[in-house]
Amino acid sequence: MELQLETFPLAPLITDVVKTIEPLAAKNANQVAVKCDGAIRTLHADQMRLRQALLNLLSNANKFTERGSIAIAARQEQENGRDHVTIAVADTGIGMTPEQMGKLFQEFSQADASTTRKYGGTGLGLAISKRFCQMMGGDITVASEPGRGSTFTIRLPMMANAPKAGAEESHRR
């Protein structure tokens, strides 16, 4: 799987993804809020894969939240002289225990069997989203507490580079 790196404005991508999820959010009586740091002009990454990761995170936030709120916030940060973008998707949903979070990014895995029965899904979305972010030199992390919701954070370099030869193999192990 090869990255299709391009330079694109981040704010319209986030707006488009939120518009896609808003009808589902309305069905669950969820409010969706967006905050995008004006300092972020463009991002050099795989736009299609970032879109898919954001759709997965927002879909999950909506799936596990009823009559609550979902917020997506993007900001630019600098670490060790490199610019990064951080995109956080936070919800006021059911939340997870540390044990559940430990299984979250494994393929075909959900928090637990009762989650699969109640909410459906294959358990592939987060594993794939994490892989996409890692291919672009970033990652996805999660913070959560049962009954209080979850926050998933994507962190990507502002200028993603194509993975070095062999990096794809290491993701398959």
Descriptions of predicted regions:
Residues 69-81:
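Short beta-strand/loop element within the Bergerat-fold HATPase_c
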Residues 4-19, 51, 86:
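A conserved beta-strand-to-alpha-helix junction within the catalytic ATP-binding
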Residues 99-106:
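ATPase catalytic-site recognition across NTP-hydrolyzing enzymes
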Residues 4-9, 26, 31-41, 77:
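Conserved catalytic submotifs in the C-terminal HATPase_c
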Residues 61-62:
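Short helix-loop "hinge" at the ATP-lid/N-box region of the Bergerat-fold HATPase_c
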Residues 137-143:
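Glycine-rich ATP-binding loops of the HATPase_c
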Residues 23, 94-95:
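Glycine-rich G1-box
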